[in-house]
Amino acid sequence: MKLLTTICRLKLEKMYSKTNTSSTIFEKARHGTEKISTARSEGHHITFSRWKACTAIGGRCKNLCDDSEFRISYCSRPTTRCCVTECDPTDPNNWIPKDSVGTQEWYPKDSRH
């Protein structure tokens, strides 16, 4: 199977809904100061790389997002944004297999299956 490099907006929303019971990477970053102060009092240090988090979900850190991209969070500083490409659901290159049910069927990345 071809390695896919595009992540769709609805796919990310689906991923978020599956993980909303626990903190996502960006929620953890937002609440990082509370965790760091607690960790320091215990002698532990938490490091978080927004750039690594952005690239881990297929995004790119840059100053401005293109028209075909949307911003998720900031990268290393407030002027640098994590931009993720919004894919075209009609493009078969943006489809993923329904491997979770053990079939060979394919469906668009951004569908609600």
From Swiss-Prot:
Keywords: Antibiotic, Antimicrobial, Defensin, Disulfide bond, Secreted, Signal. It is found in: Secreted. Transmembrane segments: none annotated. It comes from the Eukaryota. Its main location: secreted. The keyword rRNA-binding does not apply. Disulfide bonds join C54-C82, C61-C75, C65-C83. One of its GO terms (cellular component) is extracellular region. Has antibacterial activity. Belongs to the beta-defensin family. This is Beta-defensin 112. The gene is DEFB112.
